Amino acid sequence: MLLTAPLLVLCLLAALAIFARRGLSLYPRNAVGFLHPSAAAGGGGERVLWVAIDSIQKDDIKNGIDRLYVLYCTQTSGKSDDGRCEPPQEYLARVVQKQFHITLPRPIKVVHLRSSMTKWLDGGRYPFLTLLLQVVCGSILLFYESCVVNTMTPTVIESVGIPGVYPLLSIFAGSRIVAYTHYPIITPVMTQRVENGEMRYNNKGAVARHGVLRKAKVLYYKLFAHIYRWMGKFPDLVMTNSTWTKGHIQQLWGHDVPVLVYPPCAVSHFMPLRKLPHQRINTVVSVGQFRPEKNHMLQLQSFALALPRLPTDAKLIMIGGARNEEDKQRAEAVKVEAQRLGIADRVDVRVGAPFSEVSESLAQCCIGLHTMEDEHFGIVLVEYIACGCIPLGHRSGGVCLDIITSPNVGFLAATAEEYADCMAEIFRIKNDEPETYRKFQECGMATIARFSDESFGEKLTASLRRHLPS
């Protein structure tokens, strides 16, 4: 009787593996899958996905390879411009063309995943033990939906960052896994901040102040780091989007050489909008969702400190999206803080501005502002440079390691005082030394050439050749 339960579990796991592996025989050996539940969203991660598919297809065409491409994503539907209800696949193609100006050269098969399963990947659904429950529960349900309810391809590219699904795909589905990692879920720095009792958006005051709770959270983080390290052993190829992410993944997962593949940035869209220094107005523009880690309050404090040294018509324009009610409340809190600081008439908060408005604001501003600490890459800084404004970013993460790597490209800061000094200096350069401002623009353009769609495609396909059967 003692052996019955373990034996039953082993039999169930074996049956699951046999069933989940049926995709190995149902799909061609060289079929490739793309596991990206939020494929219809318009973020930077989705741009990576669609440029990746486009690049792989073009490389296959160039080399005469016939391949099946399968996208696993949450089912979406909508209406066309004329009000007609569109089939999900037609709607997806239209959205991608509209958002990213991409029309794939070959068709793809779309496997629709039920939102009732993929919604559990959202960390907001877990009020406590968020990291652990999001990764474990979300990954199990994603595996069930993609490999048990549906069938998985022999090779799968996971481009969101759902590490819990790696061991399931490898052990049960038998798939080769390629992971494109945007950022590590946990880092030693996060654990250290909890140990030090630092209050952060992910370390509330009650935990930071209470010794026992703080020690419990440190233990939880360290336990999760070990689980995360184990999950990272399963991908056959790991690619990262920045030097900062590469260093952390190498340390956490033990991969000897994660491949650095910078994300594709739409630099060609912004370049025609660029204006010369004398055509630019005295504005500081910040672009970023109203999430806590974006640190909009630091932007207000810095601007308030700098104002006495800025032109009399200088303004701070804060543009961002609001994912939910909490983000909307944060945007309102920014307005309240601007009022408290006495700079409300010099601050313009715009929630959900259209892309055309964002582009126009960046094309004519003086400074592109960024204040997020440990940003894994910082694609918005690339967009600032492409638009011709001087970037002012946080001295951390991929921002300083990959983008503003030279004082000839932009400025870096960490405190409100440093940001204020940099703002004053950039405005001085624009208004008193336009030729110096032009040199910043030229150096910036030379720097961001490596972040183009073409550079991404070349590095991606070269890295994949050993892992994608022809």
Predicted regions and their residues:
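Membrane-proximal helix-turn-helix segments that form the acceptor-binding/catalytic region
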Residues: 197-238, 246, 251
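Conserved donor-binding/catalytic core segment of Leloir-type glycosyltransferases
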Residues: 34, 239, 274-294, 300-305, ...
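A conserved mid-protein helix/loop that constitutes part of the nucleotide-sugar donor-binding site
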Residues: 43-51, 282, 291-307, 329-332
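Nucleotide-activated donor-binding/catalytic signature segment of Leloir-type glycosyltransferases, i.e.
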Residues: 104, 331-356
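Short hydrophobic beta-strand element within catalytic cores of glycosyltransferases
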Residues: 386, 390-394, 404
